Each structure stands twice: as structure tokens, then as C-alpha cells.
A protein has these predicted regions:
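Short hydrophobic alpha-helices and adjacent helix-cap/hinge residues
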Residues: 2-7, 11, 26-323
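Bacterial N-terminal signal peptides
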Residues: 11-19
Length: 323
């Protein structure tokens, strides 16, 4: 009996030792914190692309790296708490998805490397001194879209459009930048614009309903708050039978009409490769901001049918049914 108890004690000690060694090994793995402003198709795709690129290169959560993903639900207070959490955990790298995420994180640490994605203009957002050499602990990928071509798409699909409604969030630097550019391209195309901004998701319904009464088409940049509320905008536009032209494909899947934009999944993969470089010792302050150079049409045939908009023959190959 004593022999059995002794063997059991030895077995228990060995088990605890192996568990402790495993835990210690896990703690030695590089820790990547991911902070995402809000859930919507574009930001989710960027995150998926980032993680897939890491996985394909052998950086697997729980095996060769650790990943701590947090979503701020569009709340500045939650963003701040997430940043504090990552600093307390002494993460090795942060992926900040969307401008506000990167700004909050960068405002709290000058030492932890921060890679951004789904950010339009790092310099305007005061995240970098220049795109060529950021100069701070922040680099990443930009989601700047071909805005001039997107405005041209309005003319191509709805040639009788005389006025365009701009709907975006006033506190999102990325949206402000794109709206400023869009205003110039709209006027250059011989159209007028009407602008309504929102502060949060609660404002979207009233803003959308106001705009559709005044314009022939809507244009929405890659705006996170509005993107997360696309079904509301869709409902308002369908009621007045006007098209919604958007900054990215995720907004089309949410109820928009058409876009020519980047792939956020590919943007995330591009950011993942940058993360591998940073984990390998690259100096993030000298890593140029990267961008996508290929753009894709996405046309919502379901929406076009609802509002009676004919899709030009040359764009039919890009038309999809959206449930």
C-alpha cells in the first residue's frame, strides 16, 4: 500500500512538473495583441487575412505564437482599456485594426511595435511622419481606395445623377479624408453634393433618411460606424429607390449597390507579412506604409433589382446576388 501511494505521489509530481514546463514554454511564445474597433465585414476580413498569413508562414496561435484578440465595439472607453491591457501583458506586437484603434494604442505606448491596417492616412492621423519612413513605433497598411474611380462609377451606373449624398462619421479621420477627396471629384464630374455626418451608430438612421430625401445617390467611404449600420442605410435608400456607392465590398454585402475597391483580406495578409518582419527584428519606425494596387468591382444585383437600376453590360460579370 505504501509503495502504491509512493508511486502515485511521484506520478503526481511528474505531472505537475510537465504542466509547469508547458505553461512556461507557452509564456515564452511571442504574444500578439489584436485590437479591432468594431465588427463588420471589412475589418473582420483584414483580421482573417492577417492570421491566415501568419499561419501559412508557421506562426500558429498556441504553437509558435500567442494571439490575444479584443473587440472595442466602437467604444473609446473599451479601446482605452484594451490598450492598457496589452501594455500590462507586455505584448510583443499589436495589430490595430482601424484608425481609432491605432491612435488609442499609439497614445499609450512609444515602445511596443504597432502595425495598423484598415487605416486610410497615417500622416493625417498623426501615426507617422511620412509614408516612406514613419519615424514612430507605428507602421502598417493603408486602405486608401480609388475614390476618383468610385465617383466615376456613379456616372457609369447612374448617368442621370445630379446630386450625391455623403454620409460618414465626423470623428473618423479616415472618413474625413475620403469625404474631402470625394467632394472634389463629385464637383469635377459635374454633380453637386450634400453632406451629413454622424457621431455614432444611433445617428445613422436619421442621417440616412434625411439624405435620401435630398439626393439622387449616396456615397459612403470606408467608414466603420456607417459600415456596421449598412442595413439601416439600405432600407432608407430602397424606400426612395436610390443607389448606394461605397468605399469597399463589405458594405455592398451589407446592402450597398456597387464599389470598386481593395480586398481587405489581402490587405490583412500583407500586414501579416509585415508582422513576421517585425517579429524577426525589423525596425518598425523605418518600415514604409504599404498599400494595395489592385482593385475589384463588386455589384449588388439584388439591390439593383430592388431600385430598378440597370447594370451596364461591361459590369455584369461582377454582379452578385446578395441575400
Amino acid at each position: 500500500m505504501r509503495t502504491l501511494k509512493k508511486r502515485m505521489a511521484i506520478l503526481l509530481a511528474l505531472t505537475l512538473m510537465l504542466f509547469a514546463l508547458g505553461a512556461a514554454a507557452g509564456e515564452d511564445l511571442p504574444l500578439i495583441g489584436i485590437v479591432q474597433l468594431v465588427e463588420h465585414a471589412a475589418l473582420d476580413a483584414a483580421r482573417d487575412g492577417f492570421l491566415d498569413e501568419l499561419k501559412d508562414q508557421g506562426y500558429i496561435d498556441g504553437q509558435t505564437i500567442r494571439v490575444d484578440y479584443r473587440n472595442a465595439q466602437a467604444s473609446p472607453d473599451i479601446l482605452s482599456s484594451i490598450a492598457d491591457h496589452f501594455i500590462g501583458e507586455e505584448v510583443d506586437l499589436v495589430l490595430a485594426i482601424a484608425t481609432n484603434s491605432a491612435q488609442t494604442m499609439a497614445g499609450k505606448t512609444e515602445t511596443i511595435p504597432i502595425l495598423g491596417t484598415a487605416i486610410t492616412d497615417y500622416v493625417v492621423a498623426k501615426l507617422a511622419k511620412s509614408n516612406e519612413e514613419p519615424g514612430y513605433n507605428v507602421s502598417g497598411t493603408t486602405d486608401m481606395n480609388p475614390i476618383e474611380q468610385q465617383i466615376a462609377l456613379i456616372r457609369q451606373m447612374a448617368p442621370d445623377t445630379r446630386s450625391v449624398g455623403l454620409l460618414y462619421t465626423s470623428s473618423e479621420d479616415n472618413s474625413v479624408t475620403q469625404a474631402r477627396m470625394a467632394r472634389g471629384f463629385i464637383e469635377a464630374a459635374g454633380m453637386q453634393y450634400v453632406e451629413v455626418t454622424v457621431n455614432n451608430a444611433n445617428d445613422v438612421q436619421q442621417a440616412a433618411q434625411s439624405l435620401v430625401e435630398q439626393v439622387d445617390a449616396l456615397y459612403i467611404p470606408t467608414d466603420n460606424i456607417v459600415a456596421s449600420s449598412m442595413p439601416i442605410v439600405h432600407e432608407a435608400a430602397v424606400a426612395k429607390k436610390i443607389p448606394i456607392f461605397c468605399g469597399e465590398a463589405g458594405q455592398i454585402l451589407g446592402g450597398g449597390t456597387a464599389t470598386l475597391g481593395i480586398s481587405y483580406y489581402n490587405l490583412g495578409r500583407q500586414t501579416g507579412q509585415m508582422a513576421i518582419d517585425v517579429l524577426g527584428g525589423a525596425d518598425i519606425s523605418t518600415m514604409p506604409i504599404q498599400s494595395q494596387t489592385q482593385f475589384e468591382y463588386t455589384i449588388n444585383k439584388t439591390m439593383c433589382d430592388l431600385i430598378g437600376l440597370e447594370i451596364p453590360a461591361e459590369l455584369l460579370p461582377f454582379a452578385i446576388e446578395v441575400p
